[in-house]
Each structure stands twice: as C-alpha cells, then as structure tokens.
Amino acid sequence: MTPNEYQEQTHSFACYEKPISYENIGCQMITHELDWTYPALGLAEEAGEVVGKFAKAVRDESGNISGERREAIKKELGDVCWFVAELSTLLGFKLEDVLQHNIDKLTDRKNRNVIKGSGDNR
C-alpha cells in the first residue's frame, strides 16, 4: 500500500464532529470551521501514548521492549499515522508529498552539515 492509498482509506474513518464556526459569534480572528481541531489534538494525545509506552519500559523493564509492549507501541504508532494522514487530508496535502518534503528537508540539512543543529529553518 502506498502512503496516498493509506490516506484515502483512512479518511473514510474520520467520524468526528466539526466545531462550530466562530464566524457566527463575531470572532474576527477565526472565520472558518476548525476542522483540524480534533485531529491535531488527537495527534498530540497518540504521540503521548507512544512516549508513555517507552516510559513504562524504562520504569518497569530497565528500558527493554518486550514483545507485548512492542505490539502495543505498534498500535499506537498506527494511531499516530492516522492523525498525520487526516491532518494532511484536511490541509489539502497528499501524504506522499508530506513524506517527500521531509526527506528533501533532511537531505538538505545533512548535505549542509546542520542535521544536528537546532531550529526549524536551519
């Protein structure tokens, strides 16, 4: 399965309510429906769950990742992927383009010897 095929398939599972538009209550800062709210917050939550699995491995198993914990991490990584794909869809990006852009950025940083640096635009 390609990333774009994954994106198309996973979007069919997007069953969440979109918040009301602030436009109709007079807010000048935001004038569109916040379609991205749930997926953005969900991405943070799922990424936290991945980190939590590693934290418990450190706490409970001296950092070893057991087979059961490994499978639990795989499930959470899948959830992270769903939210990344959904946000990409809502923002009008093809997932393959997002992934290629990331490779291009990392390649450029590596070629300029700044991959270990700090900052988004290094």
Where are the language model's segments positioned?
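Flexible "arm" and connector segments at domain edges
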Residues: M1-R122
